[in-house]
Design a protein with these regions (language model features):
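Extended active-site and interfacial segments that coordinate phosphate-rich ligands
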Residues: 3-4, 57-83, 107, 111-162, ...
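Extended, hydrophobic alpha-helical segments in both membrane/secreted and soluble proteins
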Residues: 5, 190-192, 224, 285, ...
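A long amphipathic alpha-helix within ATP-dependent nucleotide-binding catalytic cores
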Residues: 94-96, 156-194
Length: 709
């Protein structure tokens, strides 16, 4: 098998050192070899098979001079007698071929292994392990190694030793790995060596540790990154999973009745975390979307509206039967018809219950009673929150079919915080910070919009509600900029389904931010009586055990602190393909700097807000670290935005984002503010730098770099 694979590689143009296959008693023909030193390797009949690799089970002899090759061949053949590996794994070997491979020795400056899929079960993570010298020293842990993780969507990071490996080889090795995987049509384990700037393939075999009987789980953060940007603390991660489980369970029961039992195992897997970041477990969503009428048409629309880049679709469930499809068809049509009335009712219900719980939390200080209030809020609010998912689907479909008309939508709910802030700044300018008028308007702003900020669904996020002084600081900063006062005028707006559903979507998002703000307030009160800010390093289950059972979690808190530091060094990976539920280790992680020579001057994305402007780039990775005066009149380049960014977008000239879709917050606010916007630009943050001069076209969806800084 090993020799067969080498022949295939050689015949397909890969650089394979010259080799010859001989039996232990055969003569060796050295005439076509060009080196004086050789590697003598095993070629057992069962080696490098589909189920068992036999890695390291038989002898390999390196740096063998010509006169000693025959002796090395006999030694390698003799090692076939040892079959402990087969006995321990219950392998029945019938054909013990005793041939041996004689191969030209590569004088390697570096060598290593490429796993085209992470053997732990991450299918789109190519792992490249490199060390100095020959491969035997690397495999035998005799040399320091560095490990590169190269995701097929572009993100890369490394871990391990700081050996001086020329990193331009990483891209070349990645390309070779992809070519070899495509050639054999399966994940491969590839040994390589580098001599004089040339990469040689020494052997290639199938990765045997991957169990493809396990389900493939696809994680995607295309849209969820707006709500949960960056690394999230443990409490946020556990709460997000619980919320999605409750909401989808309720939606399933509403739409499917008793038939929901066939799909209940999916609901705890709607979202998950990976490397400290939140992801949609999109493979579960596909199973649920498959229930819808015309699902083959709806799923691509849904992918497009959420900004999902890969069109690959996988299902873990069998195709639903006609009864389930019929029931859901009628449920779906009914819910679409009543969706806007239901959304109005939900908003009224929310306001009433919000006032009730706000008063209860304000008066309560006992951690046990506060915890019960938290669980009661979950039950009350999320019991009907599945209606927002139905409205989202209505919004996706109606907006998609409305096309460019939706770009002209006016006066959406998400514009109100910006208008209220302008009013507050005007009051500050006219009456001063200590005036009763300013204090009243400040209190009102915090009441309604105090929790609308960057990362508002992350419970650890500090908002204007938790830190009111930060609002004063913002107002003082904005007061120094010219205030734009827009006179209101009556504009007739046809109440199309696209506009109604999109507006209700924004109302529900604002209500959601207020709800999470109330829960944040409750958690902060529990924290004051228990472990302080460390409460955010605990899961909901751990908080319960701490309050009611008196358990102590100092070790777990310290571990979580350390993991957060590691997570911060992992680049954002847009898509992850997992085989089953693998254990993933992240350690000693360093992001890989992209090669500047690969920059492009013309970047393509999706235009989501009309207009064309030229201007200077300001690159933002954390909006909390920039001042409004630094953004004014410039074009923002970022990974993604969320509702807290409207302050920056208001003073910016335009917006470019690596992620996003027509219905992302970036798009909605940009349209309201009439700022050109292009989203979904792959690799944007590696292509532009602060100070670059660019031309962006929000109609056609491109960014042209005119001058680099």
């Amino acid at each position: 098998m090993k020799a067969d694979n080498l022949r295939i590689l050689s015949e397909n143009g890969f650089s394979v050192p010259k080799f010859q296959v001989v039996g232990p008693n055969e003569d060796i023909d050295f005439s076509h070899f060009e080196t004086e030193l050789f590697a003598v390797r095993s070629n057992d009949a069962h080696e490098d098979g589909g189920k068992f690799s036999y890695a390291g089970q038989f002898l390999t002899v390196l740096n063998v001079p010509k006169e000693n090759v025959k002796k090395a061949v006999l030694a390698v053949a003799d090692s076939y007698k040892i079959r402990y590996y087969e006995k321990s794994l219950g392998i029945k070997s019938e054909n013990n071929n005793s041939s041996v491979i004689i191969q030209e020795m590569v004088k390697a400056s570096y060598s290593g292994v490429i796993f085209t899929s992470n053997p732990k079960g991450i299918l789109n993570d190519m792992v490249i392990v490199v060390g100095k010298g020959i491969g035997e020293n690397v495999v035998g842990d005799k040399e320091e190694t560095v490990t590169y993780h190269c995701y097929k969507e572009g993100a890369s990071y490394k871990e391990g030793s700081d050996i001086l490996f020329p990193e331009h080889f990483v891209k070349e090795l990645e390309k070779l790995g992809n070519r070899i995987e495509k050639l054999f049509n399966k994940p491969m384990d590839i040994e390589f060596a580098i001599e004089d700037e040339k990469i040689y393939i020494l052997q290639a075999r199938e990765i045997t540790s991957l169990d493809f009987d396990l389900p493939v789980r696809i994680l995607d953060n295309s849209n969820i990154a707006e709500s949960y940007p960056g690394v999230c603390k443990k409490l946020t991660r556990s709460f997000a999973k619980e919320v999605y489980t409750k909401i989808f369970t309720r939606l399933g029961r509403r739409a499917l009745g008793k038939s929901v039992k066939y799909y209940e195992d999916l609901f705890p897997h709607m979202v998950c975390d990976f490397g400290g970041r939140m992801y949609y477990e999109i493979s579960s969503w596909y199973d649920i979307l498959r229930l819808l009428p015309l699902s083959s048409k709806i799923i691509p629309v849904w992918q497009k509206m959420l900004g999902v880049e890969s069109e690959k679709i996988t299902f873990s469930k069998e195709k639903p039967n006609i009864y389930i499809k019929s029931r859901l068809l009628f449920s779906f049509l009914y819910l679409m018809v009543v969706s806007q009335r239901k959304m109005r009712d939900l908003s009224t219900f929310f306001k009433k219950e919000f006032r009730y719980f706000d008063k209860k939390i304000e008066k309560e200080d006992d951690p046990k009673k506060l915890y019960f209030l938290f669980k009661e809020m979950e039950e009350i609010f999320f019991r009907e929150w599945d209606l927002t998912l139905i409205n989202d689907m209505v919004s996706f479909l109606s907006t998609y079919f409305a096309g460019d008309k939706v770009k002209k939508s006016l006066s959406l709910e998400s514009k109100k915080p910006a208008e209220a802030l302008n009013d507050l700044i005007y009051t500050y300018k006219r009456f001063g910070k200590e005036s009763p008028k300013y204090r009243r308007k400040r209190e009102k702003y915090i009441k309604y919009y105090g929790d609308r900020t960057v990362g508002e669904l992350k419970l650890e996020t500090r908002t204007f509600s938790t830190n009111p002084e930060s609002l004063d600081k913002l107002v003082e900063e904005r007061e120094k900029l010219p205030l734009k006062i827009k006179k209101g005028k009556y504009i007739y707006k046809r109440k199309s389904l696209a506009r109604l559903s999109t507006n209700n979507r924004e109302i529900s998002r604002l209500n959601r931010s207020r709800l999470f703000g109330l829960m944040r307030k409750l958690i902060d009160k529990i924290a004051l009586k228990t472990v302080g800010d460390d409460i955010y390093h605990l899961s909901l289950e751990q908080i319960r055990d701490m309050i009611f059972l008196g358990k102590e979690f100092s070790d777990e808190i310290n571990e979580e602190r350390n993991m957060l530091l590691i997570y911060e060094n992992i680049p954002t990976i847009r898509r992850v393909e997992l085989l089953g539920n693998p254990d993933i280790d992240f350690c000693d992680v360093q992001a890989i700097e992209e090669d500047g020579d690969e920059r492009k001057d013309f970047l393509i994305g999706r235009g989501v807000s009309s207009g064309r402007v030229s201007g200077e780039i300001i690159k933002i990775t954390d909006m909390r670290k920039v001042l409004l005066k630094d953004v004014k009149g410039k074009i923002i380049a970022t990974y993604s935005t969320d509702p807290g960014w409207f302050l920056l977008l208001d003073v910016a000239k335009g917006i470019l984002a690596e992620r996003g879709s027509l219905l992302s917050h970036t798009a909605i606010v940009a349209r309201e503010l009439k700022k050109p916007a292009v989203v979904g630009i792959k690799g944007l943050m590696n292509q532009v730098q602060t100070g670059d001069i660019v031309d962006i076209d929000g109609n056609r969806g491109y960014c042209k770099i005119i001058k680099r800084s």
